[in-house]
Design a protein with these regions (language model features):
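Flexible helix-coil linker/hinge segments at domain or subdomain boundaries
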Residues: 59-98, 117-129
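Short, surface-exposed amphipathic charged segments that create phosphate/polyanion-binding patches used
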Residues: 85-87, 103-106
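N-terminal catalytic cores of peptidoglycan-degrading enzymes
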Residues: 1-3
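A broadly used, surface-exposed interaction patch
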Residues: 9-26, 66
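Short, well-ordered loop/turn elements at secondary-structure boundaries
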Residues: 21-23, 32-35, 82-84
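A structural signal for short, well-ordered beta-strand segments and their strand-loop junctions
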Residues: 27-31, 39-41, 88
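Short beta-strand
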Residues: 26-33, 68-72
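Modules that initiate DNA replication and primer synthesis
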Residues: 5-8, 17-20, 34-51, 56, ...
């Protein structure tokens, strides 16, 4: 799965710091347009609906609650010809790409080569059950009847400029 953050300019290093602070296993890549694609990798098959719920919680905690979440569909009907939506993958035209992973090496942020990206995938792959129980915005059972983005906002606080919208959503 992935999050697509279209914010320009975007400080990829701060984004990585926040994800590490939240202990979210993922890889941040620069997108074609300079935003970020945050990729999540799993050791086993994962239900798309479950992924989307947790990804919404993570995106809210990052302050990007309106970013796109991939997969966009919770299910597709193959017999009807559905194929789902796509996201541009990193390392297109890998010799001179603008779409690369950003990793921390020896305390510094670096543009990862394709082989380093593949190595990083092995490090961040997680089990779906571990991903779903990440305590992003506090205890997993906090306010279970609220939508994920509101649970996160109520647990970690409302970002500047979001007070009125959050109050209206409540």
């Amino acid at each position: 799965g992935a999050l697509d953050i279209d914010e320009y300019p975007l400080d990829h290093n701060k984004l990585i710091d926040k994800l590490e602070e939240l202990k979210v296993p993922c890889i941040v890549c620069r997108s074609k347009s300079g935003g970020a694609h945050i990729f999540f990798f799993f050791k086993e098959w994962m239900n798309a609906g479950d992924f989307r719920d947790k990804a919404a919680e993570i995106s809210s905690a990052l302050g990007h609650g309106r970013c796109e979440i991939f997969p966009k569909q919770e299910q597709i009907l193959v017999e009807r010809g559905d194929v789902g939506n796509f996201i541009n993958l990193p390392y297109f035209d890998s010799e001179q790409t603008l779409r690369y992973a950003i990793i921390r090496r020896e305390g510094a942020y670096v543009e990862a080569s394709l082989s380093e990206f593949i190595e990083e995938i092995q490090k961040v792959k997680t089990l779906p059950k571990d991903f779903l129980t990440l305590p992003i915005g506090g205890p997993v059972d906090l306010l279970p009847n609220y939508i994920p983005c509101l649970r996160t906002k109520l647990a970690i606080g409302v970002f500047e400029g979001e007070r009125n919208r959050t109050a209206f959503q409540l």
